[in-house]
Every structure is written in C-alpha cells, then in structure tokens.
C-alpha cells in the first residue's frame, strides 16, 4: 500500500487528509461485511461473524530494513480514531523499527481497546527460518487471523481448528494396522 500512498502524495493526486479518509472508509466498509456462512451456520447466525482479517503494520521490508513508514503511523491513527473491530490490527515490532512507532502503538493499546496486538518480528523471523522457510518468505510473513503466523502468499492458516475425534480414536485403537486407517507405513 505504501508505494501507492507515496506516489499519490508525490504527484499531488492524494492529500494526507484524503488518505486518512480513504483508510477510514475502508475500515467502515470492511466492518460492514460479515463473513459468509460457515458449514452448519445459517446466514442469520453468521451476520455478526467476521473472517478475522488482520492488518499488519511495521516489521521488516523484503531487504531486511525497517518496514515502518509514514503510512504506518497514519494507519495507527485510523485504528485509534475508528475503534471498530474489523479489520483487526497488529504491529510487528523489530529491533530495526524506530522507538516512536512502538510508543505510538502502545499509546493505543493503553486505551483498553484491545488493538493493535503486538508481535515480535525478530522472533517470528527466527521461527520461520528454523522451520525451513527462505529468508525472503520469512521477512514477508507475519500474523494472520487471530495469532497464526504464516509466510504470506506461500501458505494458508486454517482458522477453524476442527478436530476429527473419531479418526483419532480409530488410529489409537488400530495403530498396529496403519494401512487400515489410511496412514500407510511409517517412513
């Protein structure tokens, strides 16, 4: 989003207040879009259920540099001004980010609104690398949904957390016969 913001300001097609208003309109529009009904959930029951979209602000750029920019601060302003539940927001804090960015986010957290959540980008990066992700994918990832971390554009987080309890019981009872429960042979 930042390249469009910077270009608009540079060529005069966008003013700071217009950018703020566009972001506020996005927040309102997003908040008015309930999630589609889930399996076994009617449209009426789903009317106030959201898809847990999460706006990531801050963190690192693809080259490993500080990912905070003027738009990051504007988004924090909008989060504080709008105080609506969707989209959820989070800040990625890295040792490379400027202290005023962290302090600005903490001033919003202090209000008790519950947003933005705060994630340690450096720890997320280490976890991604430990899990075998490339450095580029690790830098380009973050949190999605509630708190799941993923490499954006490379993988998906399942938010439902459904458990197949009958399958677990079947595996527990028939572990010696792995083929009978569709597991094949141990590798």
Positions of PLM-derived features:
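Conserved catalytic cores of very large enzyme subunits
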Residues: 1-187
């Amino acid at each position: 989003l930042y390249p469009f913001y910077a270009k608009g300001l540079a060529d005069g097609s966008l003013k700071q207040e217009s950018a703020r208003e566009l972001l506020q309109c996005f927040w309102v529009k997003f908040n008015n879009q309930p999630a589609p009904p889930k399996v076994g959930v009617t449209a009426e029951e789903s009317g106030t259920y959201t898809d847990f979209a999460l706006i990531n602000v801050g963190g690192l750029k693809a080259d490993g540099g500080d990912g905070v920019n003027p738009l990051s601060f504007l988004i924090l302003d909008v989060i504080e001004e709008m105080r609506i539940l969707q989209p959820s927001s989070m800040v990625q804090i890295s040792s490379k980010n400027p202290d005023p960015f962290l302090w600005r986010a903490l001033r919003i957290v202090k209000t008790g609104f519950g947003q933005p959540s705060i994630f340690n980008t450096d720890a997320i990066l280490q976890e991604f690398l430990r899990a075998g992700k490339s450095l580029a994918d690790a830098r380009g990832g973050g949190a999605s949904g509630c708190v799941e971390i993923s490499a954006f554009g490379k993988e998906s987080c399942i938010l439902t957390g459904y458990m197949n309890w009958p399958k677990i019981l079947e595996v527990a009872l028939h572990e010696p016969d792995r083929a009978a429960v569709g597991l094949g042979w141990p590798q």
